[in-house]
């Protein structure tokens, strides 16, 4: 086995569920894709392909949505995080409606799909976006910043007006199976006080205790409790990984985020792509380009 090659899934695998915001049934299929094709969403009901690109982002309210013409795909961040975290460069993500199924609210079901499918190496070198200069964007007390680094690191601080989610931080260096172990199982969350407002806006129609952590004034309403003591911050890390996947390739850089969300994450991606002086794109050509130990899913432990 070599590590410089691009990878795709080895066979078609599917799952079903409901859309978190639409409440509509949805079937998702991960299918092999050619080298250098990247991640592409396919609206099977419309026969339209929507590449996973930042310039196609059309909405960042409570989730990230991409669209090409009338073909929209919503809540893409969890499956994008799973594909990126598991080192998949090329994949057709087929869906039979306007939203990716939320499943259990985390990326773990998509990780399981990828493991079920297996992976296949391709005869093309992986491309990496290498951050050479710091890039930062702020919105009041919110921050998203990328700095040069020898791997891919995410350091997120979540801080909400609630005693259970105050100044909660999580930092992870994405190496080997770190995404699967430390990030993938963290679920999306919401506050009970916000549910009525979200549903009035046409959102969260498919939300339940089966696919989201719900927090009331004092406690967690889910009978099973939390999967991690800092699950909220871990899920924000998951979201950030999915959002940064819209750069179109793995990243070599360190992301620091404070109270950031989908909108600020995508603003950072746009700023990076708009400034060729802050980054460069490299392509691996052989195992000689890869460090001795296995590379991380979203970067390499040593500079290329």
Swiss-Prot record:
Pathway(s) served: Glycolipid biosynthesis; lipid IV(A) biosynthesis; lipid IV(A) from (3R)-3-hydroxytetradecanoyl-[acyl-carrier-protein] and UDP-N-acetyl-alpha-D-glucosamine: step 2/6
InterPro entries reported in the protein's UniProt record: Ribosomal_Su5_D2-typ_SF, UDP-acyl_GlcNac_deAcase, UDP-acyl_GlcNac_deAcase_C, UDP-acyl_N-AcGlcN_deAcase_N
GO molecular function terms noted in the UniProt entry: metal ion binding; UDP-3-O-acyl-N-acetylglucosamine deacetylase activity
Source organism, top-level taxon: Bacteria
Disulphide bridges, residue numbers: none
Binding-site positions, Zn(2+): 78, 235, 239
Pfam families: LpxC
GO CC, alphabetical: membrane
EC category: hydrolase
Protein name: UDP-3-O-acyl-N-acetylglucosamine deacetylase
């Amino acid at each position: 086995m070599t590590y410089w090659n691009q990878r795709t899934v080895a066979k078609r695998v599917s799952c079903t569920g409901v859309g978190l915001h639409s409440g509509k049934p949805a079937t998702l299929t991960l299918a092999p894709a050619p080298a250098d094709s990247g991640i592409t969403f396919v609206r099977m009901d419309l026969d339209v392909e929507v590449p996973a690109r930042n310039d196609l982002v059309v909405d960042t309210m409570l989730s990230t949505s991409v669209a090409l013409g009338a073909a929209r795909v919503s809540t893409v961040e969890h499956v994008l995080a799973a594909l990126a975290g598991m080192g998949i460069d090329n994949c057709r993500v087929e869906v039979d409606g306007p939203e990716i199924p939320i499943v259990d609210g985390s990326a773990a079901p998509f990780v399981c799909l990828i493991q079920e499918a297996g992976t296949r190496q391709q005869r093309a070198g992986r491309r990496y976006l290498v951050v050479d200069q710091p890039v930062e964007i702020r919105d009041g007390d919110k921050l998203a910043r990328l700095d040069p680094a020898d791997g891919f690191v995410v350091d997120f601080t979540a801080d909400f007006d609630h005693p259970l989610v105050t100044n909660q931080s999580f930092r992870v260096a994405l190496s080997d199976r770190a995404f699967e172990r430390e990030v993938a199982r963290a679920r999306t969350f919401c506050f009970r006080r916000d549910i009525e407002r979200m549903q009035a806006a046409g959102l969260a129609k498919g939300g339940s205790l089966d696919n989201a952590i719900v927090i009331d004034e004092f406690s967690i309403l889910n009978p099973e409790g939390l999967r991690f003591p800092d699950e909220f911050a871990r899920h924000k890390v998951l979201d950030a990984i999915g959002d940064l996947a819209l750069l179109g390739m793995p990243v070599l850089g360190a992301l620091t985020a404070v109270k950031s969300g989908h909108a600020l994450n995508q603003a950072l991606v746009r700023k990076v792509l708009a400034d060729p002086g802050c980054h460069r794109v490299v392509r691996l050509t052989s195992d000689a380009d890869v460090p001795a130990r296995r590379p991380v899913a979203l970067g390499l432990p040593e500079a290329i």
